Amino acid sequence: MKASIALIKILKSEGVDTIFALSGNQIMVLFDACLDEDIRIIHVRHEAAAVYMAEAYARMTRRIGVAMVTAGAGLCNAIAPLFTATQSQTPVLLLSGDSEVELDGKGSFQEMDQVKITCALTKYSERINETKNLIPNVLKAIKFAKDGVPGPTHLALAADILNTELAEPFTDLKQDYKSARDVEEPSARLIKAFASAERPLIIVGPFFGMPHFAEKLKELETQLNAPVVMMESPRGFNDPRLGNIKSMINLVDLVIVVGKPIDFTLSYGSVEAFNANAEWFAYI
């Protein structure tokens, strides 16, 4: 079995049924494999659109979003949405065609160090340059995209590797791992702090803005009798959707942050914005 077919079979075993793509050169063998595996391809007119659509698909379906582009300018056009997916905490896998391994360093068509470009914008980026690395790297890319605080990952797929036969027979694989989102029981210190707090505030990150979390967050507010604020706007506390919260946060005596950096949107947790005596717990 060719590596291209095995890759698509892995994606299908992980629940992928749709890929957003712009065709070209090195990835055409993956288009053929998608047709064989009955995976829907939604073709776009620009590579950035493929990644943005994969991000939206992931947020609406609770699945990983997959985008597929070709090498060179194709990969470069797909860069900006990786930053967006990082900020929105959305599990996206970007697959890009790449030049042949056997021609590395010879100035082959669209040769470039893709990983060096994408590594700063993804949770995991790797070039598959040997068939033996195909299965573990694909599974790792999916795991990293979903695990902990979700985000984008990237695999550069060398054209000659995609057309190479696997050395060992392929068997359907499905990952079985405990997600880092399976948070451990709250610490005794947190429980004690929450019990004594008079005005607690819970802040959650963009990941919790996905539609299926809306009711869960309302239930959490009711059960804890504490406001739960989902923050995804770069406006932070100035987001009109949050009403007059900016004038109230300096009254809070306990702040619990889940899945969100204490960044500029939270005024860096400064004493000018928050109660200087407030106790903080952050699960980032």
Say what each PLM segment does.
Residues 1-284:
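N-terminal alpha/beta PP-like core and its mobile active-site loop of ThDP/TPP-dependent enzymes
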